[in-house]
């Protein structure tokens, strides 16, 4: 599911600030960009970075590792494992990168509560949409549960639509 919070992105300032923070963290760690830091490098990063920069770096490093693992999980058809990664990514975006919003957090929690395999904020954050990995037979019930929960929490009723993953863009032989 794609869950549009109907919140306009407010990331002009927030996204620019996160970018500056990540660039500063990379500079202090002596790398070109944080994606170069392995998970094992986070312990060293904790000793070198101020707390906020460490949390930003931890999000980027751990999310990079999650993306790599997600490729393997999708190839093997492990949708439950993929769902766990999506949810872990959302927690990292919310807690370490601080780019989620209460409406999106509500949608993610409602999707998970309704049985989604996983859910997370998507895009640059600070508004926008989330996605939820849902079994086909649970699309309608999950959509209804999310819309109701978000509205009951005092946010605009989100626009929700079902999508299907595909092989992506490719070149015909």
Predicted stretch roles:
Residues 1-118, 133-173:
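C-terminal nucleotide
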Residues 127-133:
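Short beta-strand->loop micro-motif that forms the acidic, two-metal-ion catalytic signature
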């Amino acid at each position: 599911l794609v869950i549009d919070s109907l919140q306009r992105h407010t990331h002009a300032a927030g996204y620019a600030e996160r970018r500056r923070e990540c660039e500063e963290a990379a500079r202090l760690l002596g790398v070109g960009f944080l994606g170069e830091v392995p998970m094992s490098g986070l312990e060293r990063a904790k000793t070198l970075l101020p707390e906020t920069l460490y949390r930003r770096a931890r999000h980027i490093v751990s999310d990079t590792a999650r993306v790599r693992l997600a490729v393997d999980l999708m190839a093997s058809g492990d949708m439950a494992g993929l769902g766990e990664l999506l949810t872990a990514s959302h927690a990292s975006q919310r807690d370490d990168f601080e780019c989620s919003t209460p409406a999106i957090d509500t949608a993610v929690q409602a999707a998970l509560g309704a049985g989604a395999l996983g859910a997370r904020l998507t895009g640059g954050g600070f508004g926008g949409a989330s996605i939820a990995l849902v079994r086909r037979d649970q699309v309608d019930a999950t959509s209804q549960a999310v819309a109701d929960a978000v509205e009951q929490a005092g946010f605009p009723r989100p626009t929700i639509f079902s999508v299907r993953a595909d092989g992506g863009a490719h070149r015909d032989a």
